[in-house]
């Protein structure tokens, strides 16, 4: 048990999260501009803010490792601003359309507030390709700082996922994609030697459990699959008894 801002927190509570978006972040080589304050700590530092994708679906689970149970599951589509479309590739991959976001989605501010509160309950936050997911959420936090309710509910939201902020609150991060790279040992297509590629979530699951899960690229499915792989890494099944 530790204290954070006078409140007790559990060492064993983790948050696993995933987002679906309107598209991919453009390649960095397409940009030559100087870093902005927001982008200075991001892997995607030289991509202009307006070119980042918008979140179409956010899911996270708060999980207690000590009791092996889900404490809270959040999963929602997110409404998009006027004039923002979902790329054909993203829609085909996820099955999410602008109509789905409009009919079933929640305001982005509501989703961000829920995520902000979840992070502050955790001792570790986890994602598959953490760099992408945390960058997209950080961008959305920055975009919505003009909303008064958001600012009141989420102090420092625009830097909540920066390494300095997380370190100051003893919150660690974990990327299953990076963690499993040297475990899965998958070479790039056509290669039989050299560096291993970063494994996709379905590749990690197949490596561990012998089959690929269905309906990936739904944020909720991705989160539960990521959680399953993470738990395997730290608590692998016991070997069968002999004799």
Predicted feature residues:
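N-terminal accessory regions of nucleic-acid-interacting proteins
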Residues: 1-39
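Metal-dependent phosphoesterase core characteristic of DEDDh/y 3'-5' exonuclease domains
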Residues: 2-13, 52-98, 116-243
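Catalytic-core regions of hydrolytic enzymes
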Residues: 102-121
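Generic detector of short, locally flexible boundary/turn motifs and exposed helical patches
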Residues: 18, 36-43, 89-93, 192-193
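A short alpha/beta connector and helix-capping loop motif
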Residues: 27-60
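Short loop/turn and capping residues at structural boundaries
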Residues: 27, 102, 216-217
């Amino acid at each position: 048990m530790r204290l954070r801002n006078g409140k007790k927190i559990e060492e064993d509570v983790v948050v696993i999260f995933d987002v679906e978006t309107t598209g991919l972040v453009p390649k960095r080589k397409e940009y030559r501009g100087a870093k902005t304050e927001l982008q200075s700590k991001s892997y995607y530092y030289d991509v202009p803010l307006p070119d980042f994708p918008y979140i179409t679906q956010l899911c996270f689970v708060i999980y207690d490792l000590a009791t092996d149970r889900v404490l809270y599951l959040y999963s929602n589509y997110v409404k998009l601003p006027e004039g923002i479309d979902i790329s054909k590739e993203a829609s085909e991959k996820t099955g999410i359309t602008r109509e789905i976001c409009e009919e079933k989605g929640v305001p982005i501010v509501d989703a961000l507030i829920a995520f902000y509160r979840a992070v502050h309950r955790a001792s570790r936050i986890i994602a598959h390709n953490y760099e992408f997911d945390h960058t997209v959420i950080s961008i959305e936090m920055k975009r919505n700082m003009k909303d008064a309710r958001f600012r009141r509910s989420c102090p420092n939201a625009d830097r909540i996922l920066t390494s300095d902020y997380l370190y100051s609150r003893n919150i660690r991060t974990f990327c299953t994609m990076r963690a499993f790279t040297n475990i899965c040992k998958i070479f790039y297509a056509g290669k039989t030697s050299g560096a291993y590629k970063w494994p996709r979530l379905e590749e990690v699951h197949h490596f561990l459990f012998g089959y690929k899960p269905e309906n990936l690229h739904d944020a909720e499915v991705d989160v539960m699959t990521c959680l399953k792989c993470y738990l395997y890494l730290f608590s692998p099944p016991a070997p069968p008894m002999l004799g």
